[in-house]
Structures are given as C-alpha cells and as structure tokens.
Design a protein with these regions (language model features):
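C-terminal membrane-exit region of the final transmembrane helix in multipass inner-membrane proteins
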Residues: 3, 336-365
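Alpha-helical transmembrane segments
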Residues: 5, 9, 14-15, 27-55, ...
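Membrane interfacial helix motifs at helix-loop boundaries and amphipathic/re-entrant anchors
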Residues: 40-45, 49, 64-65, 230-253, ...
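Membrane-proximal extracellular/periplasmic loop immediately following the first transmembrane helix
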Residues: 45-98, 110
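Peri-transmembrane interface segments
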Residues: 220-260, 268-271, 275, 279-280, ...
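Short cytoplasmic-facing helical segments at TM-TM junctions of multi-pass membrane proteins
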Residues: 265-292, 362-364
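Transmembrane alpha-helical interface segments in multi-pass membrane proteins
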Residues: 279-325, 331, 335-343, 347
Length: 365
C-alpha cells in the first residue's frame, strides 16, 4: 500500500475531510440505531419479559393487522387453546392503557394483569425483585417509572378510573407502548375493563409450549385467532410496528448515502490519479497490486472514520441514556459500524474500474 499511503500523506486535507464525513455518518447511524433500540425497549420490554412461545390474539377483521389493543379472546377460544396445548401452558393476559392519578399528578399508564398459569411476578415487566409483592383486589404494583411519574412509594394510594388502589410494591422497569406499567390482579382488571367499556375478556393468551406452525394454524382456524411467534409477537403492539419501520428505513437510507459518499469520493480521487496509475502500469506494477493499494486506502479511511464514530457513541451513549431512551451495545454500535464499512468498501469498489482500465501509454504522452 505504498502508493496509497503516499497519497494520504500528500493530500492530508482531502482525506481528513472524507474521514470526518465518514465519522459523522457513523455518528448519525449509531445514534439513530441506539435510539431505535431504546424506543423499542420502551415500547415492548414488558411483552418480551413474558417469554411466551406464542402470543394468541383474536383474528383481525379484513386486511387489518393483529393488535393487542383491539384483541379480545372469547371464552370458547381460550378453552380451545387450553384443550389443545394444556391448561397449565396457557396464561390469560389483560392490558389496558389508562390514566392514573395521585394528588394533582396524572400520568398515562398501562395496566397489566394475568390469570393463572405462567409466573409473571407482579406484572411490571423486566427487572422485578425476586420477592415482589403480587397485586390483590385492592393493591397494585408499580414499575419504577410509574412510581417516579406519580411521585409515590409503597404504601401510597393512587386513583385509577375513579377507584383507589394501594401501592403494594415498586418493582420492575416495564413499559408498554411507551408508558410505564402497573401490575393489577386479574379480578380487579376484569372489573375495571367492564367499567370502562371493555368486555373483561383477555387481550391475549401466552402459550408456553412449543408447537409447530401447522399445529398453530389448525388451532387458530378453529378458535378464530392468530398466534405469532418470535419477533412477530412484538408487532402486536401497534406503535412498535410503525416506529421500527420508520426508523429502520431512515437507518437504511443513511447507510446507502454513506456508501454513495465514499464511492463518489474515491471515484473522483481515482480519476484525478489516472495519469499516476498509468505511470505505475508503465513501470511494471501489476493491476492486482494497484487494486490492493486502492482498496487498502479506502479501508484505512473507513476504519479511522467508523472507529472514531463508534468511540464517540460508546462514550456519549451512557451519558444521554439517562434523559432519552438510548441503548448502547454491540448491536447498536459495532454491527452498524461493520455494515457501514462493508457498504463503504462496496461504494469504493465502483472506483476500481479506472484502475483496471488505466492505459500505460498515457504515461508516454
């Protein structure tokens, strides 16, 4: 990479500019990816904490997508699933988004209740204490963010839909559709659901049993339900589907722009060096050596720019995560960085045609 390194030393300003541009693009992609991860966590971390093999919801009408907020599992559908996979493997779950109040403070929350079956603890999502107090008819459990927003501690009284509940425990960090979670007993949730215009039927069934897609399709057809598994479970939260789709498209566009910018720079730079490359060809340099030189040059720029961007994200990410939903880990930093490096090399590869087509006779003109 002798020639490439000499080019970098000779044109420090140009290479510094493109390196800074790559770093800024890495920062944009990295921060957007971290924000996407943080928003996803604030959207569906409670759903993920259920660790269900499948989440059963009522079948949507027409071309609509299945949504937990509009799903209502009829008793006969629940009974059919229990008969097919075992009653102990099916847990009814109810979710209601509503306002909770304490003194003059009111905030939006998601009430989560579950029937017998899987042990979901206090119902407040991940990071619950092992000795968390389970909700009862008059007691609720608050996630940490719900308690902070309402300004309450264990033993305080909050009001939900005109009824007072005692805070039995503050535990867990769960969110549902960007609002903090409050765990409620199954009987209290059913009563509240009916009082606020609902049916009292569960929004979903958690299936903790491995069944094939064919078996699930057969049960769904008989019960008029849908039962997504894996990542598709998270799409049952409507805001997650639109949010991740929008942010994912932005990340993809930024990565494509990065490849275009790097490719354009090296294309122009290679065209400006056409005569130098022709001289090297005339002196006997093989094309393979010139190609390695050009690829090494672009890899150097990408490695420095992407590495600097990742370093800044790793330093700044933990600091901003306290005020905005931001996740800083290998999936939101290293993975986008490696992908940007790969796309940048692909973009730079389009400039290699000028290297392979350089005419040694130009050096004699």
């Amino acid at each position: 990479m002798f020639l490439g390194w000499r080019d970098v030393l000779h044109a420090k300003g140009r290479f510094a500019i493109i390196t800074v541009v790559v770093m800024l693009m890495t920062l944009l992609v990295g921060f957007l990816t971290g924000l996407t991860g943080g928003l996803a966590g604030a959207n569906v971390d409670t759903v993920r904490s259920w660790k269900a093999d499948r989440i059963v919801m009522s079948a949507p009408n027409g071309s609509q997508d299945a949504s937990m907020s509009t799903s209502s599992i009829a008793p006969d559908a629940q009974q059919h699933w229990e008969d097919q996979v075992g009653r102990s493997n099916v847990t009814a779950v109810g979710v209601t988004q509503i306002a909770a109040a304490h003194d003059d403070v009111t905030t939006g929350v998601a009430l989560v209740a579950h029937g017998p079956g899987a042990d979901l603890g206090a119902g407040t999502g991940p990071n619950q204490a092992d000795d968390a107090v389970a909700p009862s008819a008059t007691n609720v459990a608050l996630s940490e963010d719900a308690a902070d927003e309402l300004g309450v501690e264990a033993g305080a009284t909050i009001t939900i839909a005109g009824h007072e509940f005692t805070v039995a425990d503050v535990t867990g960090t769960g969110h549902y559709s960007h609002v903090p979670v409050i765990g409620m007993s199954w009987s209290a949730w059913q009563e509240l659901s009916e009082r606020t215009g609902g049916t009292g039927h569960p929004n979903a069934l958690l299936v903790h049993a491995e069944i094939s897609d064919d078996e699930a399709a057969s049960i769904n057809a008989a019960a008029n339900t849908v039962s997504p598994a894996g990542f598709e479970q998270l799409l049952a939260v409507g805001s997650f589907r639109s949010e991740v789709g929008s942010l994912g498209m932005m990340i993809g566009m930024l990565m494509a722009i990065s490849a275009l910018v790097v490719g354009a720079f090296f294309t122009v730079w290679t065209l400006q060096r056409t005569r130098d490359i022709a001289v090297m060809r005339a002196l006997g340099s093989p094309v393979s050596a010139l190609l390695r030189d050009a690829i090494g040059q672009s890899l150097l720029v990408l490695a420095v720019g992407v590495g600097a961007g990742i370093g800044i994200i790793m330093l700044v990410g933990p600091a901003i995560s306290a005020s905005v939903p931001f996740v800083s880990n290998w999936l939101t930093t290293l993975a986008p960085g490696l992908l940007m490096t790969l796309l940048g090399l692909i973009g730079a590869a389009f400039a290699l045609r000028s290297v392979t087509k350089a005419d040694p006779m130009q050096a004699l003109n």
